[in-house]
A protein has these predicted regions:
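Bacterial N-terminal signal peptides
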Residues: 12-24
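M16 family metallopeptidases and their MPP-like homologs
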Residues: 46-48, 53-79, 93-138, 167-193, ...
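Short, conserved secondary-structure transition motifs
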Residues: 156-162, 252-266, 369-378, 571, ...
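Bacterial N-terminal signal peptides that target proteins for export
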Residues: 2-15
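Non-catalytic, conformational "gating/processing" segments within enzyme and secreted inhibitor domains
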Residues: 172, 203-236, 428-429, 445, ...
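Proteolytic maturation boundary segments
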Residues: 14, 29-45, 225-264, 270-272, ...
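Active-site His/Glu-centered metal-binding helix of metallohydrolases
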Residues: 76-84, 292, 531-532, 741
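Histidine-acidic residue clusters that define the catalytic metal-binding segment
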Residues: 30-37, 132, 158, 176-216, ...
Length: 892
């Protein structure tokens, strides 16, 4: 569960806020059928058909959030969101967890100021199950005192987790400073003291008051028959009675005041922000503010220009909208040795010029062109499209996402300049800075997995499911994939894979060059790949950085060059988009002056990074898993970066960038013949230079046990990783029984063994999961969780006991059935977005797997036995050799 926020920089990045809201429909709405209805009880229903994959995403949106929390209890809405997963009359928490795990998709929720959303993504054949759950939860919730006592521990772990994030701490300070005395002074998270004082009757009252059909909007998106789906919704929801709604709290904004805020961060770079209060979502000025944000965030604008000038490492502008107000802010990142005050002066000067003289008109047109492309691209993800529709209608109060694009199309340059003059109010801006501070080197950690305290583990008994869910669990079958990719090889050795899709008028190109800097960089040249990557953003031999960005804006394209490269365009611009991508990828400018700026900045960043707790945690883990001479332990230093020349970068580029190690995947409204013609036209003349380099890491010996604690003064909670290395490759047949067993341990929601024992039954952690990682030559097994320092060893002991249990006894039939159902359902879910389709096809090529590998995997999972899983865990897992690495306070 989460509280959703909008923005860039220290908040989740949103590339063009308006695009994310207006991107469900193109200019011609009839290409995406939409069915709307309002039931007699007031429930608004929107069903959008999208046939990208046999998948459905549902979003139940209650028009209530933290704004309506009782005074002194800012996390009430968030707490009730958690308790919605603790059961309802007729549906226990155990049943809900089991069903959520079986379905395999996103089963989550988020709470915002004026909205609480419940999200579920399932195979299309299981849409009835998702709708049953949401109808049951709308009717009522258990909200028992015993459940709240347990859930309180988990939600307080979430609070601790966020408070361990310096970015969140700065965000909280910013909200308090800009919105003092209003509900906006706090976000939806809540506080530990308020949760300690919260009683279950308060939560039940909150649900009874606000969780009514006449205060909700249900959005269903995916491969469904809209009319048949609406009838299912009527049957399940129509009898839920409407209720009178309480009066809503008013937000009385006082005058804005300038302030300066600061926090320390464990990150290797600092962040300087300049934030201004602006109108909220429902203001008539909001569309112009969206366009202004896009203009100020453009890499052609002066704010980003601080980066190539060497004055900042990164720079952008963002909008964090709330219902009745919002925050617009510039955010720039800087190295540890740079002066944030000087950056603040630079940013103020740039924004002051905009307020006085306005924005470049060509950037307004470019912003609109990018919005049009992003609008069409939103149809390329079923879950994303559901989110876009839900936000547009429930949060922004629009009739459809298309309405926002229509508003943006009407915005003029004069409108943008007017809102810039009015709202870029630097005299009342809040300046905020995160200053990088190292917390020290790793130290040996005691405790390990022993200790005297013994924790009694409960049994992970599966519970009987309702009749409407039981059939879904028992259905284990291989559904034919909706994908039929075609693979071919160009004469120069480049592999081309084409997957036609027609859900949108777009084409996406994904590329990957097989590479390993750890083995391909020359001795003493560590960091050369890190210099090359940003250097590729400076255009091509024909078009310098600004000219290249302008060419992309002309067609509304999004492009990135590197060993992983891509371009996203409207179908009509496919040829031009590939031409620009190839020009950048094969003929990069690599200007010497940019090389100087990047090397100087990177050397400072690397120096700070190798002292940062996050980096020390990762390096400590690698050092514990692999021998001292392993290539993965090579690291860039300030000295190695400063010693690099442009010739070193060019030499690395020529050695690594070659067609016979490259795979390109094209997905979208394009035929295989057209794709081959255009890819061949622009990439066909590319030739390899010399012999293929070695791109594989060596097989590693088994690691020894150990425990390392990395101090991090900025955290109040520990991040914990338990790990061991594996001599397992992705193509090894044992990958599948290990993956199935990992699903039993930690693969889905909180009906897994680890989550039941570490979160649900004991409240020791907020979240826990297990991950099987396998590459071309080696693998690893991880268990990761976050908890208070006094719980680190207790939680680790549970994890080790569960690993032993997987080896000592066969998985129960119900557990195995649920894990199989989960993995089988994840197959169609992985095909529900164009990005996932493209990257998954590249991965299969990278690991020498057949393109229809998911079909093979499904048959393996169906036939697999509990004995197969037990044998694989006995063969590969070594609980006594687990390494424990913690980041945060001293673990106990």
């Amino acid at each position: 569960m989460s509280r959703s926020r909008r923005g860039r920089g220290i908040w989740p990045t949103l590339a063009g806020l308006a695009a994310s809201l207006c991107a469900a429909l193109p200019a011609h709405a009839d290409t995406a059928p939409v069915l709307r209805a309002t039931l007699d009880n007031g429930l608004r229903v929107i069903v959008v058909r999208n046939t990208l994959a046999p998948v459905v995403a549902t979003s139940v949106n209650y028009l209530v959030g933290s704004d309506e929390a009782p005074p002194g209890f800012p996390g009430t809405a968030h707490a009730q969101e958690h308790m919605m997963f603790r059961g309802s009359p007729g549906l226990s928490a155990e049943q809900l967890a089991d069903i959520g795990s079986i379905m395999g998709g996103n089963f989550n929720a988020n709470t915002r100021e004026s909205l609480t959303q419940y999200l579920f993504t399932v195979p299309a054949e299981d849409v009835d199950v998702a709708l049953h759950i949401e109808a049951t939860r709308m009717r009522g919730v258990l909200d028992s005192a015993a459940d709240w006592d347990q859930e309180r521990g988990a939600i307080e772990q979430e609070v601790a987790q966020d408070l361990s994030n310096p970015g969140y701490k700065l965000y909280a300070q910013l909200r308090a400073a800009m919105f003092a005395g209003t509900p906006y002074a706090h976000d939806a998270l809540g506080t530990r003291p308020s949760f300690d004082a919260t009683r279950v009757n308060m939560l039940r009252q909150f649900h009874d008051a606000w969780y009514a059909p006449n205060n909700a909007i249900l959005v269903v998106v995916g491969d469904v028959d809209p009319n048949a789906t609406l009838e299912k919704i009527r049957a399940l929801f129509a009898s839920i009675p409407a209720r009178p709604l309480p009066a809503r709290h008013l937000v009385h904004l006082g005058p804005a005041h300038a302030a300066h805020l600061s926090v320390d961060t464990d990150r290797p770079t600092g962040t300087q922000m300049l934030a201004m209060r602006v109108p909220g979502l429902h203001s008539p000025d909001f569309p112009a503010l969206e366009v202004l944000t896009d203009v100020l965030a453009s890499e052609r604008f002066d704010l980003y220009g601080l980066v190539p000038q060497g004055k900042a490492i990164g720079a952008t502008f963002a909008l964090d909208p709330l219902p009745q107000a919002g925050v617009a802010y510039a955010v720039v990142s800087f190295s540890k040795d740079e002066d944030p005050k000087a950056l603040d002066v630079e940013v103020r000067s740039i924004l002051a010029r905009v307020a006085r003289h306005g924005v470049p008109p060509e950037l307004v047109q470019a912003a609109k062109q990018q919005e049009r492309r992003q609008t069409e691209f939103q149809k390329n993800s079923i879950e994303g499209l559901a989110s876009v529709w839900a936000d547009a209608v429930a949060l922004y109060g629009l009739d459809s996402p298309e309405e926002d694009l229509q508003r943006i199309e009407k915005v003029t340059v004069a409108d943008v300049n007017r809102v810039a003059r009015r709202y870029l109010d630097l005299a009342h801006a809040v300046s905020a800075v995160m200053t990088p501070q190292g917390s020290g080197r790793p130290v040996a950690s005691g405790g390990g997995f022993g200790g005297q305290e013994s924790i009694s583990l409960g049994e992970a008994h599966a519970t009987a499911l309702p009749e409407w869910a039981r059939a879904a669990l028992e259905r284990l079958e291989v559904k034919p994939s909706s994908l039929h990719p075609l693979m071919s090889t160009l004469p120069n050795g480049l592999t081309l894979i084409v997957q036609p899709e027609d859900v949108s008028d777009t084409v996406s190109v994904f590329g990957h060059i097989r590479n390993r800097p750890e083995v391909e960089a020359g001795a003493g040249k560590e960091g050369v790949n890190q210099v090359l990557e940003p250097l590729l953003a400076y255009g091509s031999e024909k078009l310098d950085r600004l000219a290249f960005e302008s060419a992309l804006d002309d067609i509304g394209a999004d492009e990135h060059a590197g060993t992983d490269f891509d371009v996203q365009v409207l179908a009509q611009n496919f040829d031009r988009g590939v031409a620009l991508l190839a020009d950048n990828e094969l003929h990069p400018a690599l200007p010497p002056e940019a090389m100087s700026v990047i090397s100087n900045q990177l050397s400072q960043v690397v120096g700070a990074r190798i002292r940062s707790p996050g980096y020390q945690t990762q390096r400590s883990l690698r050092a514990a898993l692999f021998p001292p001479d392993d290539p993965s332990l090579r690291e860039a230093t300030p000295e190695s970066v400063r010693a690099l020349s442009l010739d070193d970068v060019l030499s690395y580029y020529r050695r690594v960038f070659r067609p016979d190690l490259t795979t390109i995947v094209v997905v979208g409204r394009v035929s295989p013949e057209q794709a081959r013609e255009i890819i061949g036209k622009y990439f066909g003349a590319w030739q390899a230079d010399g012999q293929k380099p070695d791109t594989d890491l060596p097989i590693a010996p088994a690691n020894k046990p150990g425990a390392v604690a990395v101090p991090d003064a900025s955290r109040v909670q520990d991040i914990v990783v338990l790990a061991q290395n594996l001599a397992l490759t992705r193509s090894d047949p044992d990958y599948y029984p290990l993956e199935l067993g990992s699903a039993v341990l930690g693969g889905g929601f909180y009906s897994t063994r680890l989550s039941i024992e570490m979160r649900k039954n004991t409240g020791l952690v907020y979240s826990v999961g297990s991950t099987l990682q396998a590459g071309r030559t080696r693998g690893a097994y991880y268990i990761q969780y976050a908890c208070d320092p006094q719980n680190v060893s207790k939680a680790a002991q549970i994890a080790v006991q569960e690993l032993h249990s997987m080896q000592d006894s066969a998985v129960g039939g119900d557990e195995l059935l649920r894990a199989k159902a989960l993995l089988l359902r994840q197959i169609p879910l992985s095909e529900a977005s164009v990005d996932e389709i493209g990257h998954d096809l590249i991965d299969r090529r990278e690991y020498d797997l057949p393109l229809d590998e998911p079909d093979h995997a499904a048959r393996r999972y169906i036939d697999m036995t509990a004995a197969d899983v037990q044998a694989a865990f006995r063969k590969w897992l070594r609980p006594a050799d687990l390494v424990r690495v913690t980041q945060g306070p001293t673990p106990q």
